[in-house]
Amino acid sequence: MNIETLELARATPGLRHSLQVHRYGQPGRGPKAAIQAALHADEVPALLVAQALHRQLAALDAAGQVLGDVVLVPYANPVGLAQQLLAQHQGRFDLRDGANFNRHVPDLTATVAAAVAGRLGADAVANVALVREALRTAAAGLSARNPVDDLKIQLLRLAIDADIVLDLHCDAQAVMHLYGLTPQSALCEELGALLGAQAILLATESGDSPFDEACSRPWFVLKEQQPQAALPLACFSTTVELRGEADTGHELAEQDAAALVEFLRRRGVLAPASAAAPLPALRCQPTPLAGSEPIVAPGSGVVVFHKQPGEQVAAGERVADVVDVDTGECQAIHAVSAGVMYARVATRWATPGKRLAKIAGTTLARTGKLLSA
């Protein structure tokens, strides 16, 4: 194992940020996994799981159990970690311009498609190597205008040629859930079973280029553009939502890290255990991200929930109220679709149009940008 420090572009004189990168195994030997924690810097359960994961991976590396190459960024957003506003941590949006740290990650698809045009054939192994080299070259050619651009670019360079990318996040109040590409449903189910996920949200494009899709979608698009070529989806990239922001127990973090380690074992990144355990039963079936129903406040007031994260909701069921503090009127909010309420806000004051909760339904068919701000 070794630790590398990557300096980010400076914002102002006297102020520096850097990324710490932990590496296990040997680059170029076997499958590569890239794991990063808390790109949304206030989603701190990811930071704790990363520490547990580091301990487990370091022990495995010392024992010669890392067959491939594992890159772990234990805190993926030093800029966001430093942001405080009125004594409150602000880690989701850049205070400089309000941009979401996990949106508009550079999309290398067009550059790579041009680089490999007419060069993909019937040899899948050769095709994967060619596309990976083109991805590395495209990422190396990116330039940054500010520290946040540089952050996204440096993280992308660490992960763009990986077989597996695990982007560790959490929600406000939530159960374990995952986001992934629709064609990679089987791998999402395997990881979801190990983690005990209660929702798995799938899409071919969620909008605004989040980090996981910046790594996986180039493969999907190239395969769509060149169906005659033998080109597998060679990067499995997923966003892992590690429950809610207050779920920071040590035992829970060790459990989640062990599940991620087991997934890496099953994918050949780590040596298999001497006595492999059977895959746990899946706690949910994947559903389309387009079917996820946002529960939206009809006006301002105090929020009262009738459902807890992880509970099933029936179509038409009352899930929350918003109580007007001028009139005392209680505005009930009913779900349109059936499914599990997998996340909700942690605060209890609503403004008109605020997203209060999310239900993993199957009947809606939303279009456009499918993720929240």
Each language-model region and where it sits:
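Structured catalytic-domain cores with a bias toward divalent-metal coordination
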Residues: 1-373
